[in-house]
Amino acid sequence: MYHVIAATTNPAKINAITLAFDDVYGPGQYRIEGVNVDSGVPLQPIGSTETRIGARQRVKNARQVRPKADFWVGIEAGIEDNMTFAWMVIEHLQARGESRSASLMLPDIILQGIRQGRELGDEMAVLSGISNVKQQGGAIGIFTQGKLTRTSVYHQALLLALVPFHNEIYQRPSPSKPAI
């Protein structure tokens, strides 16, 4: 049985991790433990690079907190231009898989608050009247009227981040390049 460390205690993120590991390894083949670790980036990361660093840092910190595990999973949501998205980082032994989620264009009323230093989740709570939005369906759930959720979008990206660990082509050595 695999021991999976989720570098989060957010239920929406843990549900996405559960769905992805169910799909790839099967229900009952792993156990997930959520740990609260720092991302090392601002609460609302701006740009793909900063967001990816946050996901990688979560994995690094989770490995320090729980070094005896099989997988470590970090998810960090961010904003780039007028889009929200997230980076998924999964490490297993000495290998890493990464994927970026689908993006959602945000309305100007939300972006204005973000430019003033507020988090997307806080802006969504004010505008929707739903507290703790980011631990539920997220902005994605509100804007798609539940057709997609934070969990469903992260689930898809996590499946992609898991590919290097179960697809045998990733395990093959690279052929050496011919001399020029």
Swiss-Prot record:
Hydrolase found in the keyword field: yes
Binding site for substrate: 8-13
Record Gene3D superfamilies: 3.90.950.10
Cofactor note: Binds 1 divalent metal cation per subunit; can use either Mg(2+) or Mn(2+).
Known EC number: 3.6.1.73
GO annotation, biological process: nucleotide metabolic process; thiamine metabolic process
One GO MF term attached to the UniProt entry: metal ion binding
Catalytic activity: XTP + H2O = XDP + phosphate + H(+); ITP + H2O = IDP + phosphate + H(+)
Keyword Zinc part of the UniProt annotation: no
Top EC class of this enzyme: hydrolase
Needed co-factor(s): Mg(2+); Mn(2+)
Keyword field: Hydrolase, Magnesium, Manganese, Metal-binding, Nucleotide metabolism, Nucleotide-binding
One Pfam family, short name: NTPase_I-T
UniProt: Mg(2+) binding residues: 38
Function, as annotated: Phosphatase that hydrolyzes non-canonical purine nucleotides such as XTP and ITP to their respective diphosphate derivatives. Probably excludes non-canonical purines from DNA/RNA precursor pool, thus preventing their incorporation into DNA/RNA and avoiding chromosomal lesions.
Subunit and partners: Homodimer.
Record-stated family: Belongs to the YjjX NTPase family.
Protein name: Inosine/xanthosine triphosphatase
Organism encoding this protein: Yersinia pseudotuberculosis serotype O:1b (strain IP 31758)
Taxon lineage: Bacteria, Pseudomonadati, Pseudomonadota, Gammaproteobacteria, Enterobacterales
